[in-house]
A protein has these predicted regions:
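A short, well-ordered alpha-helical element
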Residues: 161-179
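Gly/Ser/Thr-rich loop/hinge elements
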Residues: 190-239, 243, 247, 277-285, ...
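Bacterial N-terminal signal peptides that target proteins for export
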Residues: 2-14
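Terminal peptide-recognition signature
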Residues: 48, 95, 153, 183, ...
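Mature N-terminal segment immediately following signal peptide/propeptide cleavage
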Residues: 39-64
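Extended, small/polar residue-biased N-terminal targeting/export presequences
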Residues: 59-148, 346
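Bacterial N-terminal signal peptides
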Residues: 12-23
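Peripheral terminal and inter-domain segments
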Residues: 34, 341-448
């Protein structure tokens, strides 16, 4: 039996979908929509029933699904469905209605337009998948060094470590000097367990049992542990934050669940989608149709269960939109609390205050904002459409976000803030540019 390491935990059609999208974007005509006859419907259902009974993780549920499909076929329920895409969608609804398993999907997969309407061979399909993964940077969407020495990695799917491992190693080595880490999985719909295993291995010192897969066929259980060796430095004492959304699914969920159950990471965002079954894709002979059949289930060594149907609940609930700013503030709080260097502590506190202001702007009435508008030497402040803008002569214009009374941040300029001073009568008379290094530049008001 092939190891689950070579089977996808979600995202089973990612590369295929990318191939089709690329072809359409290149100007190719969409493939014709094939019709289905009664004979076609019976053949497709017969193939799917065989795969379910042979492979689906829960044999009793497989039997219920098979019985439903046979019953509805015999009753003529599907007679009005005459196109293949619609039939596949209906079968997916039927199967998920019984199993409540979002991994169980029947797909119409037309051949790419550039192969003359013929189904690609396995070698051609694999070559296409690898090419698209490479063009997509093996799902490593973005990597950054954020102010305050916080590392950030946006990972939108999970490529097989056998092809994307070098990129993962490069990413983790780029992040190696970080004082805190943020993994952004808000757009991660799943992928390969081997990539989870590789990246998680950088976060633990001792060998750690991350997850197991029970596989119904053969009644086997396979364990996944962190790797004994990684290329570069481990980040075992660096605080970790994982961003999630309702879209985060399958392998993306395992990544989060592993770190949550081991208390190695803090989950920030929304409860995830709830899919914990690895899948195998089966072709339906004679038709451009595949069925994703969950063949096993995840078993966490600490909780003894998984996230199927429930999702991974965040430790810090917030919207997906606010998750990054929320995690960034918490990361800076952690770094600030740990550091002994007073200069670094002051710099990190500055970043934390600015990030908090962006996340939770200080409320200022529009009438009060207009009171700041004016000219301050080389600096101009304008009130436009209920917002305040700052501009230094000869430079760009930036929005001012209230941080406190008479204190504003500029989101694009982490190192700079704008403060205003008042006279005894409460009138704004001076603008002071504040810098993260402690320097300040006062400018008296010269015009309103």
């Amino acid at each position: 039996m092939q190891s689950p390491c070579n089977r996808r935990l979600g995202g089973a059609a990612v590369a295929v979908a990318i191939v089709a999208l690329s072809a359409l974007q290149a100007g190719a005509a969409p493939p014709p929509v094939p019709e289905v006859t009664a004979k076609d419907r019976a053949a497709i259902i017969g193939s799917i029933v065989g795969d379910l009974n042979d492979t689906y993780v829960f044999a009793d549920v497989a039997e219920k699904m098979a019985n439903l499909l046979r019953k509805e076929l015999a009753a003529g329920t599907y007679d009005g469905v005459t196109t293949l895409p619609a039939f596949c969608e209906l079968l997916t609804v039927e199967l998920q209605g019984v199993s409540h398993d979002r991994h169980l999907i029947v797909r119409w997969e037309p051949p790419p337009p550039d192969v003359g309407g013929k189904p690609p061979s396995a070698a051609e399909e694999r070559a296409r998948e690898l090419a698209e993964l490479r063009r997509g940077n093996y799902c490593f969407e973005r990597i950054e060094h954020l102010p305050g020495n916080v590392g950030y990695l946006k990972l939108d799917c999970l490529a097989d470590a056998g092809v994307g491992g070098a990129t993962a190693v490069a990413a983790m080595n780029f992040l190696a000097g970080s004082d805190a880490l943020i993994f952004d999985l808000r757009d991660n719909g799943g992928g390969e367990p081997s990539m989870i295993q590789l990246i998680n291995s950088y976060l633990f010192e001792a060998p750690t049992h991350l997850n197991s897969f029970y596989i119904r066929k053969g009644d086997q259980t396979e364990q996944f542990w962190t790797q004994a060796h990684v290329e570069g430095s481990r980040l075992t004492d660096v605080p970790v934050f994982v961003l999630t959304s309702g879209y985060t699914f399958s392998g993306g969920e395992e990544f989060a669940y592993n770190l949550k159950s081991t208390k190695r990471g803090t989950i920030v965002g929304e409860t995830t989608g709830g899919g914990a079954h690895p899948v195998r894709r089966f072709p339906v002979a004679g038709y451009p149709v595949t069925v994703n059949v969950p063949f096993g289930l995840a078993i966490n060594p600490i909780t003894g269960t998984n996230w199927e149907g429930t999702g991974v609940a965040p430790d810090v609930p917030t919207t997906a939109t606010a998750a990054l700013d929320t995690a960034y503030v918490k990361a800076l709080e952690t770094v600030e609390a740990k550091t002994k260097d007073e200069v670094v502590k002051r710099e990190v506190a500055w970043m934390r205050e600015g990030a908090t202001a962006r996340l939770q702007p200080f409320a200022v009435a529009e009438s009060s904002l207009r009171g700041y508008a004016g000219t301050y030497g080389l600096r101009t402040v304008t009130s436009e459409g209920g917002a305040l803008n700052y501009q230094r002569r000869g430079r760009g214009k930036f929005a001012l976000v209230p941080m406190a009374r008479d204190l504003f941040v500029i989101p694009e300029l982490d190192y700079f803030r704008v403060a205003f001073e008042r006279d005894a009568g409460g009138q704004v008379v001076r603008l002071v540019g504040l810098y993260a290094n402690g320097r300040s530049e006062p400018s008296d008001r010269t015009a309103r």
